[in-house]
């Protein structure tokens, strides 16, 4: 017999969440991440996969900028939610 100890402070909902990251070019990359993992992990993985620099792009959820320290739980993200990626706009005069 194996003893299974109930985890304290853990909700009955799944600890992982599936998120989609949608680029401006129409590409969609899916990630599975823990609800309490900082989104910087997902952001860096997306940049590595797409060959981009973190300085080149911005991530937004529901129109709001995402900070690297934010977690899916803090932003009340649900399974299959989409994060939008935008190229960093550099100011200039035409």
UniProtKB/Swiss-Prot annotation:
Ranges of residues in domain Ubiquitin-like: 15-92
Protein name, per record: Small ubiquitin-related modifier 3
GO molecular function annotation: protein tag activity; ubiquitin-like protein ligase binding
Superkingdom of the organism of origin: Eukaryota
Quaternary assembly: Interacts with sae2 and ube2i. Covalently attached to a number of proteins.
Prosegment residue ranges: 93-94
Keyword Ubl conjugation: yes
Cross-link (Glycyl lysine isopeptide (Gly-Lys) (interchain with K-? in acceptor proteins)): 92
InterPro entries (UniProt xref): Rad60/SUMO-like_dom, Ubiquitin-like_dom, Ubiquitin-like_domsf
Spans through the membrane: none
Annotated signal peptide: none
PANTHER family documented for this protein: SMALL UBIQUITIN-RELATED MODIFIER (PTHR10562)
Function: Ubiquitin-like protein which can be covalently attached to target lysines either as a monomer or as a lysine-linked polymer. Does not seem to be involved in protein degradation and may function as an antagonist of ubiquitin in the degradation process. Plays a role in a number of cellular processes such as nuclear transport, DNA replication and repair, mitosis and signal transduction. Covalent attachment to its substrates requires prior activation by the E1 complex sae1-sae2 and linkage to the E2 enzyme ube2i.
Coiled coil regions in record: none
Keyword annotations: Cytoplasm, Isopeptide bond, Nucleus, Ubl conjugation, Ubl conjugation pathway
Posttranslational mods: Polymeric chains can be formed through Lys-11 cross-linking.
UniProt xrefs under SMART domains: UBQ (SM00213)
This protein's GO CC annotations: cytoplasm; nucleus; PML body
Locations listed in the record: Cytoplasm; Nucleus, PML body
GO BP terms, alphabetized: protein sumoylation
Disulfide bonds, paired cysteine numbers: none
The family this protein is said to belong to: Belongs to the ubiquitin family. SUMO subfamily.
